[in-house]
A protein has these predicted regions:
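Central cavity-lining transmembrane alpha-helices of secondary-active solute carriers
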Residues: 103-124, 171
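Interfacial helix-cap and linker-helix signal at transmembrane-aqueous boundaries
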Residues: 86-87, 123-125, 210-218
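Intracellular juxtamembrane helix-capping segments at the cytosolic ends
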Residues: 169-183
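Intracellular loop-helix junctions on the cytosolic face of multi-pass helical membrane proteins
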Residues: 2-57, 184, 212-351, 355-360
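Primarily marks hydrophobic transmembrane alpha-helices of the MFS/SLC 12-helix fold
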Residues: 133-134
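C-terminal ends and interior cores of transmembrane alpha-helices
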Residues: 139-157
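Cytoplasmic loop-to-transmembrane helix junctions
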Residues: 101-102, 185-195, 199
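Short amphipathic helix-loop junctions that connect adjacent transmembrane helices
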Residues: 80-101, 346-360
Length: 360
């Protein structure tokens, strides 16, 4: 996945030209800027300590704070009313699923958001760079919110899927872009990320209040429309503020070679076939679609996590000191998994409890 902690050192690799070279540097060399109509003509390549703006931070940080605040506004605003929308009756403007089915959908949605950060990071790190990955993810999210504003079952489910996919692309890569604003020895990094996380909390605090009020007075689709507006603001800030970013945001740190791309596509196809086989086997055993989906939603990410750690430990690009650090990271990773398991209950079990046991 894309590395967020340092800016790359410009360099080049030698080799025989191939047909892939004609793709406007979409498969760029490490440290080379990709060719895109969105890339500014001038970008900072000097040490980050020379880039000073608001709060003595890099000039690109305030724009990324705006992006993150509005993106989290849209995400948490939608999530605040999503379970109620799924389980409410059709006459009440919902999708009419049972409470159990709704809980499973919410769990799968939360799993997908984090799980899809893996392909989102791969696209940024190996194919199109973090800025374009974030842009495409934001566009997909806004399209999903717009679909949710349309009172139709098909568009509603489409919107949920699009938001999950888009969030998987934008969430890891926006953090990467912020990390790329600082050099390794820049002491302002910690303060910058504190501001970044503060922007997350601001957006997450305000959005449920607004979407909940809109849902109460004008219906679910009005609540989802506020999420779409929030994402539009995020995209506007992201595009307008791109001139303030470092060159790192527009590079492909570890470009994929054609033969690696073929292996990646075949591997992805194999994973999809394996997941389909697991789901079919579970359905044959349980005979209950909800149980099957819930079980698959547990087994697939666990298997993916194990496989990901195996790949990182066995990769020739990982040095011995890095493997030592990776082993030390595993307990922290397990703790983070447990934390987010509890946190994600806010959109599921906690939402059901609040709906059934509180009277506001």
């Amino acid at each position: 996945m894309a590395q967020s902690e340092s800016s790359p050192t410009p360099g080049s690799t030698s080799g025989t030209a191939t047909a892939a070279d004609d793709r406007e540097d979409e498969l760029a060399e490490p440290g080379r800027l990709i060719s895109s109509r969105w890339r500014p003509r001038s970008l900072r390549t000097t040490p980050s300590r020379q880039d000073r703006g608001l709060f003595d931070q890099p000039r690109g940080l305030p724009w990324m704070l705006n992006v993150e605040m509005w993106e989290r506004f849209s995400y948490y605003g939608m999530r605040a009313i999503l379970l109620y929308f799924i389980t409410d009756t059709v006459a009440g403007g919902g999708l009419g699923l049972s409470e159990t089915s709704g809980q499973v959908v919410i769990a799968l949605y939360g799993m997908a958001v984090y799980f899809l950060a893996i392909p989102g990071g791969i696209f940024a790190d190996r194919i199109i760079g973090p800025w374009l990955s974030t842009l495409y993810g934001g566009v997909v999210i806004m399209a999903g919110h717009i679909c949710l504003t349309i009172p139709s079952t098909v568009t509603s489910w489409t919107g949920i899927v699009l938001v999950a996919v888009g969030t998987g692309f934008i969430k890891p890569n926006l953090t990467t872009i912020v990390g790329g604003l600082y050099d390794d020895d820049d002491i302002r990094r910690d303060a910058g990320f504190q501001l970044f996380y503060m922007s997350i909390n601001v957006g997450a605090f305000a959005s449920p209040l607004l979407t909940g009020w809109l849902r109460e007075h004008y219906g679910y689709h009005a609540g989802f429309s506020s999420a779409a507006v929030g994402m539009a603001f995020a995209l506007g800030a992201f595009v307008y503020g791109r001139h303030k970013l470092s060159a790192f945001a527009f590079t492909v740190p570890n470009p994929i070679r054609p033969e690696e791309l073929r292996r990646l596509l075949l591997g992805t196809l194999g994973v999809l076939v394996a997941v389909g086989a697991v789901v079919a086997a579970l359905q044959a055993v349980t005979g209950n679609l909800v149980t099957t989906v819930a079980t698959a939603g547990l087994l697939v990410p666990v298997g993916a996590a194990v496989a990901y750690f195996v790949v990182m430990f066995r990769s020739p690009k990982v040095t011995t000191p890095e493997r030592t650090h990776l082993r030390a990271y595993i307990p922290l990773w397990i703790g983070a998994v447990l934390f987010f398991m509890i946190t994600e209950q806010a959109a599921g079990k906690m939402a059901t409890f609040a709906d059934s046991n509180t009277d506001l």
